[in-house]
Structure formats: C-alpha cells, structure tokens
C-alpha cells in the first residue's frame, strides 16, 4: 500500500455521478509524474503479475495504469471496453455498478494466445466490473491471477467476494 500523500492526491466529489456517491477521482495523480512513477512501480511489483501472461485493463481509467504496467513489465495488454467500442468477435457481459448497470466486451482474438491474466483498474468499489471481466475470461477458459487497482473502497468489502487476490495501493 502506498503513502498517505498519494491518497491526498485523489480528489473526492460528493454526489457524483449520483446523489449519495462520493466519487474518488484518480486523474489528479497524473499531474504528479514522480508520484505516478512510484505508484506504477508499486503496482508492477505485485505477486499477481509474476504468473500472468497478459493484462486486461478496464475502460477507461484502467487503460492509463494498465498501459504503464504493461510497458514496465513487457506484458501484453488487452482492453475491456464499454458497449459499441470494439470491432470483431466479442465476449460481452453485463455488470452492476455502485450507481447503475453497464456492460463490457473483450475481443476474442485478443486473448486467444494467453492463458492467465491480471485485471487492472483504477478503483475497486463493489467488484462488479472486475467480476464482469473475470466472467468473460472464465467463459473463454482463461485464468485470473488477480486484480490490481489504485484505489479500493474498503468499507464496501468487495475483495471478500472476489475469487482472486486483490492488490490495492490506496484504501479509503
């Protein structure tokens, strides 16, 4: 887990995207390159990456961190995108958000040469998004070695319901 200083760089927006939600925004971290580099270093050294063949990053903020980790570890990155964003044959699943419902898709061809994956996202809240990606990978006969996130909302206890290890850098 990272320092308290990093958690201070996460901005919080009350009642966004709907009333009752306090949105944790990781984007201000990008304005601090030294801290971002340390964050990526911390995320990249997680044990879950050692036995993975590739990374699946979740639309859209997960792409930022997944790309950096992919480059640092020289591991391929696959994207899980929201509806209507990917061409070709897809695996698609729906999921529940802390504040609604959505779906994600992965290109079948993108994962065919890899067996084990780490899922990367910016934030773990209810775990619905991570489980959605996990279900798509399982449907394709793939393994999940873990989930790596910048922020975890600890009070929601999503990690207790996920069937794979979770590595988070900041817990609120």
Curated annotation (Swiss-Prot):
User: According to the UniProt record, what class of enzyme is this?
Assistant: transferase
Localization: Cytoplasm
- What's a single GO BP term from this record? AMP salvage
GO MF terms listed in the record are:
adenine binding; adenine phosphoribosyltransferase activity; AMP binding
Describe its partners and assembly state: Homodimer.
> What is the purpose of this protein?
Catalyzes a salvage reaction resulting in the formation of AMP, that is energically less costly than de novo synthesis.
Q: What is this protein called?
A: Adenine phosphoribosyltransferase
The organism of origin for this protein: Prochlorococcus marinus (strain MIT 9211)
Highest classification ranks of the organism: Bacteria, Bacillati, Cyanobacteriota, Cyanophyceae, Synechococcales
Q: Could you tell me the gene encoding this protein?
A: apt
